[in-house]
């Protein structure tokens, strides 16, 4: 037995299995990494880090260091076993070269080497190599240092031994190819940090770090963030609920194996009114859910309902309790490890393995039942929360039906404030949500009436983070947004999901003033969309307009500027031979300061405007951020605004 175990842990060229070649990657990169925009650019880093995480899951790696270098290259260092460098018998070349140049070649396909492995697309580091203008692989293994360099996936020379080493592990340094990633090759520190933080919680005990070598601190050191969690998902839930008021003092936590499937989960009830369940399979964020989420919901509903009925707390309740009621105000993270995951859904992020339902259901039932029996005070608070949720759900349904019934009773049912467009094809129609009646009037004059609709919003809309659902549908501004769009709540599969079949516009554009109030209104609207119309964000329908901050004029010449750098450049350009005093700078504090023609040419004309599409890069991080921004605690919100808002020190 011990000899067999020894053979299986002997990681060498024989463990590297080859499935197909690299030829198509550069031709159709989006097929392999999702897209060639900002998301795909960051996905390259995740693919390399996933290799190191696989080593950690196999028990051979404890430290992963990621760095953004000065030229936006990426370096990933781990202390794993190091990619094998010996001769691959079938390929007749070094196993390192095979791993780096052949798609779907690697130890993750050999179940004796890795029991489970991560990576959504599973294309591995060879795909990163193919899409990099330069990549260098360094392997510390067996007391030696091996190196090979590549360009666009092709080796520049055979693997060579360049010296001795008392270290072990792999270092991958790569620079994305600007020909492929022609939108941007600039990495976002916060985006990478969010994923590494997530991985630290999902893989407790592993140390990860992210260094930004593009800038320096006052003491000359590089900014660095460290990620390490000994508590795993328990700490993850505490992080997500950091600015929410918990109903129970500590998250309910389980880490075990059911039916041969490792299941880790943590859950906590809080005083909010939304359900926040985040699920993972082999470290992949399954944003569409799947069988593990179905098992969790089934186990939660079954166990809580049985306890509530046994306690007698439901005997005077005159309404039926639904599964949704048991999850209101619940934050939970579920992580399962599956040897052969089957992914379904539009984005291939929905787990389809049926055997997982029962495993998670059983795990949730056991841990929750024990908790309820051992903590009667907390159990009572949870059941009271469920009863309150059921009452509120009935009120919300009535309020929602009132909004939706308007369409039937009043013909179109469109808000009186809406200036609609003449085109009826949603694919070409745009809806501008504009801050204030004044700017709304200017936008109505400046728009293209054929395909641009304008809906002015009066002041700040309701903060949905703090409101019960029925209050949301009673709010006039939200009712106007809801009815203008033509959407309804409830689908065949989910009675709380947004039904977008009758959506009237495929571009919904938030247009607010370029000041703190404008940012606040934008955030309130985005919070509403994220919590109650997330499908619109996921479908790519939500955008933010970017009106200019400055108008720089000299005589009849003028230029608009969106940043201070652009303003200064425009001043220098217009100054020319004249005096600087002759250049006039106007700072736009509100949309109403522009006339209709200016608003059209800078912010609404598809030929000249800049729209920022709203995407969800990391659902858990978005959940945490909205909770922090819209919650009651001032300190974390102020820190976030000072770090991220361009206007943090002006126009307050």
Predicted regions and their residues:
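A short glycine-centered beta->alpha linker in the GHKL/HATPase_c
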Residues: 82-87, 91
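C-terminal interaction appendages of subunits in large macromolecular complexes
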Residues: 391-410, 425-430, 441, 445-447, ...
């Amino acid at each position: 037995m011990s000899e067999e175990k020894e053979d299986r842990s002997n990681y060498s060229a024989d463990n590297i299995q080859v499935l197909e070649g690299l030829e198509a990657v550069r031709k159709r990169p989006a097929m392999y990494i999702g897209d060639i925009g900002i998301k795909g650019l960051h996905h390259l880093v995740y693919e390399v880090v996933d290799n190191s995480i696989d080593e950690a899951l196999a028990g051979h790696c404890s430290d992963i260091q990621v760095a953004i270098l000065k030229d936006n290259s990426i370096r990933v260092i781990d202390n794993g076993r190091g990619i094998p460098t010996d001769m691959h018998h079938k390929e007749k070349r070094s196993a390192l070269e095979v791993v780096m140049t052949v798609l779907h070649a690697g130890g993750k396909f050999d179940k004796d080497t890795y029991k489970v492995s991560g990576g959504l697309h599973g294309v591995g580091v060879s795909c990163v190599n193919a899409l990099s203008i330069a990549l260098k692989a360094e392997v510390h293994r067996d007391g030696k240092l091996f190196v090979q360099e590549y360009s666009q996936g092709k080796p520049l020379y055979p693997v060579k031994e360049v010296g001795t080493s008392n270290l072990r592990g792999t270092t991958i340094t790569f620079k994305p190819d600007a020909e492929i990633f022609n939108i941007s090759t600039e990495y976002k520190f916060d985006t990478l940090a969010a994923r590494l933080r997530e991985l630290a919680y999902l893989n407790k005990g592993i140390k990860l770090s992210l260094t930004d070598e593009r800038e320096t601190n006052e003491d000359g050191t590089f900014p660095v963030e460290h990620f390490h969690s000994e508590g795993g998902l328990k700490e993850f839930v505490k992080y997500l609920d950091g600015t929410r008021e918990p109903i129970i003092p500590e998250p309910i936590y389980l880490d075990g194996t059911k039916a041969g499937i490792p299941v880790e989960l943590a859950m906590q009830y809080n005083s909010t009114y939304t359900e926040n369940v985040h699920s993972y399979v082999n470290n992949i964020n399954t944003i569409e859910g799947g069988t593990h989420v179905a098992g969790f919901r089934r186990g939660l509903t079954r166990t809580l309902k049985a306890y509530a009925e046994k306690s007698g707390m439901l005997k005077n309740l005159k309404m039926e309790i639904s599964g949704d009621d048991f999850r209101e105000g619940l934050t939970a993270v579920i992580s399962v490890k599956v040897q052969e995951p089957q992914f379904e859904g539009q984005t291939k992020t929905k787990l389809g393995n049926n055997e997982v339902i029962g495993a998670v259901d059983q795990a949730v039932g056991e841990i929750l039942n024990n908790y309820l029996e051992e903590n009667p005070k907390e159990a009572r608070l949870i059941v009271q929360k469920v009863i309150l949720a059921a009452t509120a759900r009935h009120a919300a349904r009535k309020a929602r039906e009132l909004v939706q019934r308007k369409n039937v009773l009043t013909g179109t049912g469109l808000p009186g404030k809406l200036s609609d467009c003449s085109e009826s094809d949603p694919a070409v129609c745009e809806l501008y949500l504009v801050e204030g009646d004044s700017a709304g009037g200017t936008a109505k004059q400046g728009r293209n009436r054929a395909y641009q609709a304008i809906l002015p919003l009066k002041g700040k809309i309701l903060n949905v983070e703090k409101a019960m659902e029925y209050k949301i549908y009673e709010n006039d501004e939200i009712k106007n947004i809801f009815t203008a769009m033509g959407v309804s709540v409830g689908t065949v599969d989910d009675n709380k999901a947004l039904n977008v079949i009758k959506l009237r516009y495929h571009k919904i554009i938030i247009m607010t003033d370029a000041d703190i109030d404008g940012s606040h209104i934008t955030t309130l609207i985005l919070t509403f969309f994220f919590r109650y119309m997330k499908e619109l964000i996921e479908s790519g329908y939500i955008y933010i307009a970017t009106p200019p901050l400055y108008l720089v004029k000299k005589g009849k010449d003028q230029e608009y500027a969106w940043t201070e750098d652009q303003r200064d450049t425009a001043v220098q350009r217009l100054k020319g031979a004249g005096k600087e005093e002759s250049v006039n700078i106007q700072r736009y504090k509100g949309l109403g300061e522009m006339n209709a023609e200016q608003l059209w040419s800078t912010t609404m004309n598809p030929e000249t405007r800049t729209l920022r599409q709203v995407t969800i890069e990391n659902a858990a991080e978005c959940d945490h951020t909205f909770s922090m921004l819209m919650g009651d605690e001032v300190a974390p919100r102020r820190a976030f605004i000072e770090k991220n808002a361009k206007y943090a020190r002006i126009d307050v």
